[in-house]
A protein has these predicted regions:
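N-terminal amphipathic/hydrophobic interface segments
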Residues: 21-522
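Bacterial Sec-dependent N-terminal signal peptides
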Residues: 1-29, 522
Length: 522
């Protein structure tokens, strides 16, 4: 409400300046023509009845009507029938009835009121017009039409000299391509720009814009919104503190506290800056990005410095997602990190690059590259290549390990079920009695292996081709035999909860393997 008061004061400031600049000298109102002139005391003292083709003049302004009651001394008259006030070559006012005070150059107009100025048309049933300030005012429902644009409001003000209109209450703006609803609007007609103050909605054929403050360039179909700006379409919406939108190019730029909701794919993306090129099917969001994927089982939280999206331009559905720099994600049953991640939504395949790691339960999966295949919103297959390395923390103190050039990990109910290790396959796993006491360590090498896992423990290994397998009893274990070359247990990097995805995790002394955690066996 305070903002609206400021707008009103600003709008009328120039009116006051104009008023003070006017000469205070009174000018006469002259009778230019009337078919009949009759003095009739019954109509009042000094009242002259003018009948038929009445024409009055004050300065350069002419007043036409069918009849009038005119008081020459007070410069006041009432006009009746076919009122026409012609002020200059471009401004005309029409109505059925009018009251005019020549002393203050102020007119009241009644019924079928029309103000016409160049290509602008104002219509209402009651209007006042101040000739000194060029201000037209209607207090109860009016319409301004300009070319193919139409503006309707309960209250309105129009300065015809500078072609600026001010609208209040139930404002509706209609153009061939859009419809706007707002509470307060200033329309600079020459600039073809509208400034709105208060809750505003702009409807397009496909999109809807909302905001509480901003402007709309109707000529170029460009809008800028602030304070809860929202762009929505079938299946998605973008909300931010401020937003720029170009309808012709279908380009949007969102700034500060950006919130994107995709109801089709059940995804919410948050950040502080984003851009969208809808016709090209491209968009991105950056600065403290958090993405949430909602599934039946749980929600996955993902962070990256920047997130890119590719959309189907026909269906408006997301096809691919690319996350870059400092990628970290968390779900109750799986966590991960890498420096870049791409997700093809159509074939449900995620690709992790640049030092990728996945954690599930007590397992760590690592490789130069990781591909994740998803079925029914659950992890189905994970491909580690090259240099795949899987580590499982033993129930007590050791680590079971699987290593190879290319590894395919199969999941069941989001738990590791078995692993096919192809190329220089190696394993280390701990053997224990039922009471947990250690028997020894099994170390094996083969061209390929198929490893069965139950309850996060290796239970069976099937070897292919040449195999070297050695069981080291507890009493004969050599130092370092329990760790494969390249072993790194990087639990410190693992996201621990949804908020931990923002942590800039780094390897600690323990994680880098400079202590007993580093694999030494060759």
């Amino acid at each position: 409400m305070r903002c609206v008061k400021y707008i009103i004061l600003a709008f009328f400031a120039c009116i006051c300046w104009t008023l003070n600049a006017q000469q205070n000298s009174k000018t006469f109102v002259y009778i230019e023509h009337a078919d009949h002139q009759v003095y009739d005391a019954s109509f009042g003292k000094d009242i002259e009845r003018l009948i038929g083709n009445v024409a009055l003049r004050q300065d350069s302004t002419f007043f036409y009507s069918d009849s009038a009651h005119f008081n020459e001394k007070t410069r006041y008259f009432d006009g009746f029938g076919h009122i026409h006030i012609k002020m200059n070559d471009s401004t005309d006012i029409f109505s059925d009835k009018c009251k005019y005070s020549g002393d203050i150059k102020f007119a009241e107009l009644f019924d079928n009121v029309v103000l016409q100025d160049d290509s602008t048309l104002l219509t209402t049933n009651y209007m006042t017009y101040d000739r000194k300030t060029h201000l037209a005012t209607y207090p109860n429902n009016g319409t301004i039409t300009r070319n193919d644009k139409k503006l309707v409001s309960r209250k309105g003000y129009y300065r015809d000299d500078i072609q600026v209109a001010y609208f209040r209450k139930d404002v509706v703006v209609t153009t061939p391509k859009s419809r706007m609803l707002t509470d307060t609007l200033v329309y600079k007609i020459k600039e073809e720009r509208m400034y709105f103050y208060g809750p505003t909605t702009i409807f397009y054929e496909e999109n809807v814009l909302e905001g509480n403050y901003g402007w709309y360039d109707v000529k170029n179909d460009v809008a800028y919104l602030k304070k809860g700006a929202t762009l929505s379409n079938k299946g998605y919406s973008i909300t931010s503190d401020s937003m720029f939108y170009n309808k012709k190019t279908d380009y949007a730029r969102a700034m500060s506290n950006v919130f994107v909701e995709d109801t089709i794919n059940k995804v919410i993306i948050e950040g502080n800056y984003g851009e969208m090129w809808k016709k090209l099917g491209k968009s991105y969001i950056t600065d403290s990005v958090r993405t949430r994927y909602f599934a039946d089982r749980d929600t996955l939280y993902l962070h990256s410095d920047t997130l890119f999206l590719r959309m189907d331009t026909l269906t408006n559905k997301a096809e691919r997602m690319f996350a870059y720099k400092n990628v970290r994600f968390y779900r109750n049953d799986i966590q991960g990190k890498c420096d870049s991640l791409s997700y093809h939504i159509v074939d449900s395949c995620a690709k992790m690059r640049h030092d990728p790691i996945i954690w599930t339960e007590n397992s760590q999966l690592r490789g130069d590259s990781i591909n994740i295949m998803i079925a029914n919103k659950e992890i189905d297959v994970v491909l580690l290549y090259p240099n795949g390395f899987i580590i499982q923390k033993d129930t007590i103190e050791g680590f079971n390990q699987i290593k190879g050039k290319q590894m395919t990990a199969y999941f069941k109910n989001n738990e590791l079920d078995h692993v096919y290790d192809d190329g220089n396959a190696e394993t280390v796993y701990w053997l224990r009695e039922e009471d947990g006491s250690m028997i020894g360590i099994n170390v094996s090498q083969s061209v390929a292996m198929d490893i069965k896992i139950e309850k996060n423990q290796i239970v069976r290994i099937k070897y292919f081709k040449k195999t070297n397998e050695t069981l080291y009893p507890k009493e004969k274990m050599k130092p370092g035999i329990e760790l494969l070359k390249g072993f790194e247990w990087l639990d410190e990097l693992r996201p621990t909860d949804p908020n931990d995805i923002f942590r800039k995790a780094k390897k600690t002394e323990q994680d880098t393997g400079k202590t007993r955690r580093r694999g030494r066996r060759k």
